[in-house]
């Protein structure tokens, strides 16, 4: 059996998870700039590779196909790349294989926000662009929000982003990462 070498903490991908519309892409881009790393939005990368938008993939090929492509891409990025900032789609982390790969090979940050804040501030901005929200009542979306919390609870660090500007959230993540590096891999 081949022994896998652990990825040094400073070289691990930094992975942002959280509910749709939490700001993973915006915050991820800022973190990438601050740490001089490449940024990969998993949904945008899927769209690029598939040659169609996420809503088109859902409509033409179905959610199961999308989740398979998403899972394969994330596992590949986690196991075969380093020094990246990855922004996962809101439902990606619900897949056990994705969670295992992210936790084993990356540093996972959960961008957390309250239901009330999300409903008032974020939902109006994204309601028409997310296939998962299509034809759902507010009660069904609330149920989805809370169902996903148990998967999101499996992370390395959490940033509560209610009322935070994207820049402030990015600064908190960078400070947390640098602290981890200093504590767990000093003098590198």
From Swiss-Prot:
Binding residues for Mg(2+): 25
Gene3D superfamilies for this protein: P-loop containing nucleotide triphosphate hydrolases
Reactions mediated catalytically: shikimate + ATP = 3-phosphoshikimate + ADP + H(+)
CC cofactor: Mg(2+)
Keywords for the protein's UniProt record, in alphabetical order: Amino-acid biosynthesis, Aromatic amino acid biosynthesis, ATP-binding, Cytoplasm, Kinase, Magnesium, Metal-binding, Nucleotide-binding, Transferase
EC number: 2.7.1.71
Superkingdom as given in the UniProt entry: Bacteria
Signal peptide: none
Binding site for ATP: 21-26, 130
Cofactor binding remark: Binds 1 Mg(2+) ion per subunit.
Enzyme's top EC category: transferase
Cited Pfam families: SKI
Pathway(s) served: Metabolic intermediate biosynthesis; chorismate biosynthesis; chorismate from D-erythrose 4-phosphate and phosphoenolpyruvate: step 5/7
Membership in a protein family: Belongs to the shikimate kinase family.
Name of protein: Shikimate kinase
Organism listed in the record: Geobacillus thermodenitrificans (strain NG80-2)
């Amino acid at each position: 059996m081949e022994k896998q070498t652990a990825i040094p903490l400073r070289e691990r991908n930094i992975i942002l998870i959280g509910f749709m519309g939490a700001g993973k892409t915006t915050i991820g881009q800022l973190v990438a700039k601050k740490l001089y790393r490449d940024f990969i939005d998993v949904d945008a990368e899927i769209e690029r590779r598939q040659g169609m938008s996420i809503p088109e993939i859902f409509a033409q090929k179905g959610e199961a196909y999308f989740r398979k492509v998403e899972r394969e891409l994330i596992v590949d990025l986690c196991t075969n790349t380093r020094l990246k900032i990855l922004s996962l789609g809101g439902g990606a982390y619900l897949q056990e294989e994705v969670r295992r790969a992210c936790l084993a090979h990356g540093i996972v940050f959960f961008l957390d926000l309250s239901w009330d804040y999300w409903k008032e501030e974020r939902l109006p901005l994204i309601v028409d662009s997310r296939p998962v929200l299509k034809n759902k009542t507010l009660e069904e979306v609330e149920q989805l929000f809370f169902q996903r919390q148990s998967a999101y609870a499996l992370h390395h660090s959490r940033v509560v982003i209610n009322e935070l500007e994207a820049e402030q959230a990015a600064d908190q993540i960078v400070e947390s990462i640098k602290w981890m590096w200093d504590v767990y891999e000093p003098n590198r």
